[in-house]
């Protein structure tokens, strides 16, 4: 016991650092064996050598298996590192107390037996080097296959080194007491990386206190199970993270598909609205052409009983097929309310038209014309001749002088065909009572001009029949009107005459809404044989022949501005 082999071994191990990080360090096992005395106690030395060989055979495969398993657990490495450090410190602290007693139990052996021990230690170092290389390559492979791009770390635990202590009473126990042993022997350390972070282990002698060793091993085994459970939890976290990422990716794809479906649905709705609008327009046009009665007319008529919106719909088709000399001017009234929405359900159109007629207020329409902007229409008439009368009298045609219908009338005055839009219509016409007398009188004192919102193809043929003697000087048709919100307005500036000497008679007051002071309203006529409106206007018209400006007289007579202001 006094003269024996004094052995010192240093083991430098890298503990709990990532292979990827540049600041992590990898340490290798380095042993140095110095023999100062020969061991004379051969049986105990043989037992120690035998235990070293068994330990080397167990450590290498155990470490390799554990490194392979731990290569896959790369999340929460700080938590696992803290557990391993705590276990290592507690275990080595407990074993340090045993090293003193183990020294006294081991007797020196002969120098001849030191060589097998050194060979066993070199075998352990070589195995740990290979284990470090395999750990590095395994960690790199795991990093490349990591779905969530979380860096993996190599974790080295000493549990496998200490697990054999249950069966072996004497084994090699790491010690971290300092850089020198109790006898003052030198310990050489060697590191591969630049920065120093060392774990020193002193290969001292073993203790024979089986009870303390059993307690320590039991504690380390329980801690090892906790480490394994922690690594399993890390694996579960990795799987959950991968599933969350996959679910998020699927949710993004689903959201994109839903957005595309919504856009497609909106486009289909727009297309359906356009088709429905066109269908409604066609239905309204066909209804206006087929459901004609004493108060209705085809699209070449301008009938007061037609709703302005319906008139706008029917004239859209007819204006494209008839060639005219002047362009129709259209303006838009600036109103806050809009009636352009499409109704999903259509009731009886005749009832709707009657309701719209009751609701339509021509004086309110004229009041709103103050917000309208329009370009002056081009002059449609030649200059007035010097031989012509001073005052120009503008007359409306339908429901002012005559009433026409495509439905048979009782005792019509005229019947004539009209070929319109590839369709031939039979028109039945009746002249207003006292029409001939009225026309004869006014043609002698006024320049008579017909200004109608009807189509030329119809109105021109009718005028040729009711005015065979050409008492009417000029004829203007729909193409000379101004279209405003479903109504055809007659801007008197198209005449090229001085408005001080222009008078217009129309059954639709909104028709002369731009020049209210020049307009004389008259009641619409259909079939009343007792009507005398035309005859009663002659005296007032005759009173205007000698005035310089007809507008103040018309204003005082009919007081239309009061009706407009009250609308």
Curated annotation (Swiss-Prot):
Write out the biased-composition intervals (Acidic residues). Answer: 337-360
Keyword annotations from UniProtKB, A to Z: Hydrolase, Protein phosphatase
Q: Which Pfam families match?
A: NIF
Lineage top rank: taxon? Eukaryota
Q: EC? A: 3.1.3.-
- Please note every region of biased composition (Low complexity): 100-118, 130-150, 286-297, 309-332
Note down the stretches annotated as region Disordered. Answer: 31-53, 100-150, 280-361
Q: Does the record's keyword annotation contain Hydrolase?
A: yes
Q: Where is the FCP1 homology domain?
A: 386-544
Write down the InterPro entries for this protein, in alphabetical order: Dullard_phosphatase, FCP1_dom, HAD-like_sf, HAD_sf, TIM50
Q: Name one GO molecular function term.
A: phosphoprotein phosphatase activity
UniProt enzyme class: hydrolase
Please list the residue ranges that the record marks as compositionally biased, kind Polar residues.
Answer: 298-308
Q: Which PANTHER family match?
A: DULLARD PROTEIN PHOSPHATASE
Family, similarity comment:
Belongs to the CTDSPL2 family.
Biological role stated in the UniProt entry: Probable phosphatase.
Q: What is this protein called?
A: CTD small phosphatase-like protein 2
* Gene behind this protein: ctdspl2
């Amino acid at each position: 016991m006094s003269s024996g082999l004094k052995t010192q071994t240093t083991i430098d191990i890298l503990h709990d650092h990532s292979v990827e990080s540049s600041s992590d360090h990898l340490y290798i096992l380095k042993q140095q064996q110095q023999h100062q005395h020969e061991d004379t106690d051969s049986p105990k030395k043989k037992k120690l050598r035998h235990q070293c060989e068994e330990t080397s055979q167990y450590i290498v495969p155990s470490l390799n298996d554990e490194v392979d398993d731990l290569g896959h657990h790369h999340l929460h490495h700080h938590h696992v590192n803290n557990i391993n450090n705590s276990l290592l410190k507690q275990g080595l602290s407990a074993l340090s107390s045993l090293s003193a007693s183990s020294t006294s139990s081991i007797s020196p052996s002969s120098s001849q037996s030191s060589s097998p021990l050194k060979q066993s230690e070199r075998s352990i170092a070589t195995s740990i080097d290979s284990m470090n290389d395999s750990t590095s390559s395994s960690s790199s492979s795991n990093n490349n296959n990591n779905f969530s791009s979380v860096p993996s770390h190599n974790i080295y635990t000493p549990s496998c080194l200490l697990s054999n202590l249950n069966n072996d009473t004497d084994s090699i126990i790491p010690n971290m007491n300092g850089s020198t042993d109790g006898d003052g022997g030198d310990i050489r350390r060697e590191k591969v990386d630049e920065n120093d972070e060392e774990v020193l282990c002193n290969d001292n002698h073993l203790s024979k206190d089986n009870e303390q060793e059993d307690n320590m091993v039991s504690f380390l085994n329980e801690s090892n199970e906790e480490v394994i459970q922690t690594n399993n939890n890390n694996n579960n976290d990795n799987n959950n993270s991968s599933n969350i990422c996959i679910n998020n990716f699927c949710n993004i794809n689903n959201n994109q598909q839903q957005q595309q479906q919504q856009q497609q649905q909106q486009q289909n709705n727009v297309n359906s609205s356009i088709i429905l609008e066109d269908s409604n327009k066609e239905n309204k046009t066909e209804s206006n052409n087929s459901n004609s009665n004493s108060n209705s007319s085809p699209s070449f008529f301008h009938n007061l009983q037609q709703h302005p919106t319906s008139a706008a719909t029917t004239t859209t088709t007819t204006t494209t097929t008839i060639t005219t000399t002047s362009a129709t001017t259209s303006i838009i009234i600036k109103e806050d309310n809009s009636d352009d929405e499409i109704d999903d359900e259509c009731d009886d159109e005749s009832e709707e038209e009657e309701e719209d007629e009751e609701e339509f207020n021509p004086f309110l329409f004229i009041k709103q014309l103050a917000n309208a902007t329009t370009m002056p229409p081009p002059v449609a008439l030649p200059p007035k001749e010097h031989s012509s009368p001073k005052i120009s009298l503008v007359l409306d045609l339908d429901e002012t002088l005559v009433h026409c219908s495509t439905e048979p009338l009782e005792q019509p005055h005229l019947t004539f065909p009209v070929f319109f839009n590839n369709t031939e219509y039979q028109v039945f016409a009746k002249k207003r009572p006292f029409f001939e007398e009225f026309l004869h009188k006014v043609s002698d004192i006024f320049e008579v001009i017909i200004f109608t919102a009807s189509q030329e193809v119809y109105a021109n043929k009718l005028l040729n029949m009711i005015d065979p003697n050409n008492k009417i000087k000029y004829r203007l048709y729909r193409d000379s009107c101004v279209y405003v919100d479903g109504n055809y307005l007659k801007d008197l500036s198209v005449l090229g005459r001085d408005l001080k000497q222009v008078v217009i008679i129309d059954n639709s007051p909104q028709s002369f809404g731009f020049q209210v002071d020049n307009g004389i309203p008259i009641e619409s006529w259909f079939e009343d044989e007792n009507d005398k409106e035309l005859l009663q206007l002659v005296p007032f018209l005759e009173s205007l022949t000698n005035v310089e400006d007809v507008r103040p007289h018309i204003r005082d007579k009919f007081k239309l501005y009061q009706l407009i202001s009250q609308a």
